Structures are given as C-alpha cells and as structure tokens.
Design a protein with these regions (language model features):
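ATP-binding N-terminal substructure of ATP-dependent carboxylate-amine bond-forming enzymes
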Residues: 2-101
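General beta-strand structural signal in soluble alpha/beta enzymes
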Residues: 11, 36-37, 74-75, 96-99, ...
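A conserved helix-loop-beta module that forms one wall/lid of the active-site cleft
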Residues: 99-163
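Internal nucleotide-binding/catalytic subdomain
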Residues: 163-300
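CheY-like receiver
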Residues: 64, 139-143, 176
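Conserved small/polar residues in nucleotide/adenosyl-binding loops
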Residues: 73, 308-310
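Glycine-rich phosphate-binding loop signature in dinucleotide/nucleotide-binding domains
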Residues: 66-70, 143-148, 183
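Short acidic-hydrophobic, aromatic-tinged amphipathic segments that line or gate anion-handling sites
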Residues: 49-57, 128-132, 167
Length: 310
C-alpha cells in the first residue's frame, strides 16, 4: 500500500482562531506541512511562520503562495476576505477556503446582509439603516417605539466585533450612532432580540451546507457583562441546553436559504458562513452573519471534529 502524499496548507492570520485551525490540522495523519502568515509564537510550534507577510498584504500573500506552492490556503480573518485575498489567490491558481470579496460583503455590510436575508425569507430582527445624524432619533423610535427594551445600534461595516452598542440609555445609543455617522459610516438600528445567543458555523461549497457544533461566546468585557462589546472574551461548546434539532433548524431556515440566494445572484459563497443567532421567545432569529470562523468559538468547536472530518 502506497504512502499518502503530505498535503501542504497555508493559513492566513495570527490569532487564536488560526492557532486552533493549525492545531486541529496538525493532528491529522499524515500531518500536513503547515505554514502560517504571519502566524504567532504559539503557531510557530506547529507550523512554519512567515512573519513578514501580514494579513492585509495581498501581494505578499500571493508571492508566498507562489514560493511554497500550498495545496490549500485557509483565510482566517474577515478583513483580508473583504479586501479580496481569496480572489487574488484563486486568480493565481490556488485552492482557497474562504469567500470572494463579493460574497464576504455578507459580513462587510450589515445592511446588505439584511437585504439578502429579506430576499431569502431568513428570520432576523427588524431594522433601519441611517446615514445622517438627523435620522437617528426617528430611527430609534421606529425599531423601539416604547423605549422599554434596550436599543441596538450597529456600525454597518467591519468593526472587529466592537461596533455594536446594546444599551437602555437612549443618549448612549445616540452618541454611538453619531460617532459612526460622523466618521463617514452608516448605522443599522435594530429591534432588540431577547433570549440566549448561539454561534453556528456552516461549511459551504457554494451550494451545499454542513453545520459544525453550535457554541456560545461571551462578547462583553467585565463581570456580569457590564462592559462594552469586544471581539470575544471566551466561548464554550457543546451547549447542553440548546434544542437537539438546532443545527437542522439553522440549516433549513437560515444557512441553506442564504447560500441559495447568494448562488442565485451569481455570488457563490465558499467557506464558513458564521450564523450568529438569538433563540428568542418568538423563535430563532439571525443576529449577524460573518464570512469566516469566529474567534474565540473556533477554539472550542474544532476540538470536537473527528480526524476523518478535518
């Protein structure tokens, strides 16, 4: 029986998410020849790190790929995806796990994601997008007319998980909205969704969807969630309290309709569709979409995948 060829994989990124991806890949047999750009000290124990190649230097990423000739490139962070890293690498002839820049707008613009969800009949929070400071007051009244629940104010574009304010203080909501608009951005104002939040990663080849294990992360800093939103303070999985059919529900009502809508528009989504969900008293609702593995959830989800599935 012949020996299996050793696969070479390049992972773009430098965080705990990328470390988790490489750690899981390193457990395969035979172990792949792993490379990271730029990587970090923990990753360096498992892979060759190319520290000079940053996550947003697309030219350097292509040059590195042409030098080491990976069989697969995995792009971790959202920013290079939105900037077109996957497109550049595919154009150079490499196999990439990660969506095109056009598909990554699903994360890059919350307003556009809402449009996709509406077209695909995906359940989500009612919302309004404002582009002028003068529109903020009326917008808040529209999504939260009584002011009896928290206000939800989100920067439309990428903000590393820190562009969202959920507060009962109307003035704080207005202050955040003004700051985003005055910086040249748009603001998405949403109705508040009650119930626990869940993250579910769905792997897609542009037409099919396969869910991974659900997880829950903790976004706010400080004890008792007293601080502002962060990129993620921690996470755990599995979720013993979650409905047994949660993953099936999400694929049927959220992920597959979204992937189908993207394909119908000529924008196939290949990679991880991160479904951020709220299990509300009125049923499952989408809080957000991301176009990549979440961090820190990746660190607890990938540990549950059997070797045969890596």
């Amino acid at each position: 029986m012949g020996t299996l060829a050793r696969v070479k994989i390049l992972v773009i990124g430098s965080g705990g998410r990328e470390h988790a991806i490489i750690r899981r890949l390193s457990s395969d047999a035979p172990a792949p020849d792993l490379h990271a750009a730029p990587g970090n000290p923990g990753i360096a124990d498992l892979a060759t790190c190319h520290e000079a190649v940053t996550t947003l230097d697309l030219d350097a990423q292509v040059e590195l790929a042409e030098q080491i000739r990976p069989d697969l490139v995995i792009i971790g962070p959202e920013a290079p995806l939105v900037e077109g890293s996957a497109d550049r690498l595919r154009e150079a002839g490499f196999t990439v796990f990660g969506p095109s820049a056009a598909a990554a707008v699903l994360e890059g613009s919350k307003t556009w994601a809402k449009e996709i969800m509406a077209a695909a009949s995906v359940p989500t929070a009612a919302s309004v997008t404002v582009t002028e400071v003068e529109e903020l007051e009326a917008g808040l009244d529209r999504v939260n007319p009584r002011g009896e629940v928290p206000y939800v104010v989100k920067a439309d574009g990428l903000a590393a998980g820190k562009g969202v304010v959920v507060t009962t203080d109307r003035e704080a909501a207005l202050t955040h909205g003004r700051a985003v608009v005055l910086a040249g951005g748009s603001v998405v104002l949403e109705e508040f969704l009650d119930g626990p939040e869940v993250s579910l990663f769905c792997v897609s080849d542009g037409s099919r969807v396969v869910p991974l294990a659900p997880a829950q992360d903790f976004k706010r800093a400080l004890d008792e969630d007293a601080g502002p939103n962060t990129g993620g303070m921690g996470a755990y999985s599995p979720l013993p309290w979650a409905p047994q059919d949660l993953s099936e529900q999400v694929v049927r009502t959220v992920a597959q309709p979204t992937i189908d809508e993207m394909a119908a528009r000529g924008i196939p989504f290949v990679g991880i569709l991160y479904c951020g969900l709220a299990l509300t008293s009125h049923g499952l609702r989408v809080v957000e979409f991301n176009a990549r593995f979440g961090d820190p959830e990746t660190q607890v989800v990938l540990e549950q995948i059997g070797r045969a599935h890596v």
